[in-house]
Amino acid sequence: MAQEQPKNNEKSAEKTQTKPVIELLIPLEKYLAAGVHIGTHICTKFMEPFVYRVRNDGLYILDVRKIDERIRIAAKFLSRYEPSKIAAVSVRTYGQKPVVKFCNYVGCKPFTGRFMPGTFTNPSLKWYFEPDIVLLTDPRADSQALKEAAEIGIPIVSLADTDNRTEYIDLIIPANNKGRKSLALIYWLLARQILRERGLLPPDGDLPEPPSEFEVKFKR
């Protein structure tokens, strides 16, 4: 009796392996509504790995899953540091309230508005601060803080849009770092995730305020 041959459609020897899908920190729709994925019409070589696609009008779109992944990584990294030794910086107007709210929750030091030269490098200044790590909103706008952090050799975490160069940055968080809603959501998520990493919030815990409370409001 002839031995039965394996059927052609059998895949016993070659099983398809799929990577487990990690649930996003918030629903995809909330990321999209805040515009965190909206890039610019320019993309540097540094930011190419984080691009999802290019629209017909030439606008680069960031990959939301990579944004989410980097928020998790950055939160885990930042949570290892003494909060009072973390400097969070934003020269950009739309990033200033988010940075202050972030620091209120996390316990780190905010630097908003014009960054005074020598803040990290000149101990003789009355506003001198010696951080162990720096979180920047925009490598271009926050270039003075970036330069000084690199000079003293401390780790640098930074949000970066598609048009940013990222020399000296140790950990990039790809994101729209120009929009009000985007910056509010990113800093809200970072604060929440850091508190979760520290055990100050349960794994599914939320901040007592919504992301909209991190957003810059215009007076009418």
From Swiss-Prot:
Stretch list, region Disordered: 201-220
GN (gene name): rps2
Keyword set includes NAD: no
A single GO BP: translation
Protein family: Belongs to the universal ribosomal protein uS2 family.
Gene3D superfamilies linked to this entry: Glucose-6-phosphate isomerase like protein, domain 1
Taxonomy of the source species: Archaea, Thermoproteota, Thermoprotei, Desulfurococcales, Desulfurococcaceae
CC annotations in GO: small ribosomal subunit
Native species: Staphylothermus marinus (strain ATCC 43588 / DSM 3639 / JCM 9404 / F1)
Protein name in UniProt: Small ribosomal subunit protein uS2
Ion transport in keyword set: no
Entry-linked InterPro entries: Ribosomal_uS2 (IPR001865), Ribosomal_uS2_arc (IPR023454), Ribosomal_uS2_CS (IPR018130), Ribosomal_uS2_euk/arc (IPR005707), Ribosomal_uS2_flav_dom_sf (IPR023591)
Keywords annotated in UniProt: Ribonucleoprotein, Ribosomal protein
GO molecular function, one term: structural constituent of ribosome
Domain of life: Archaea
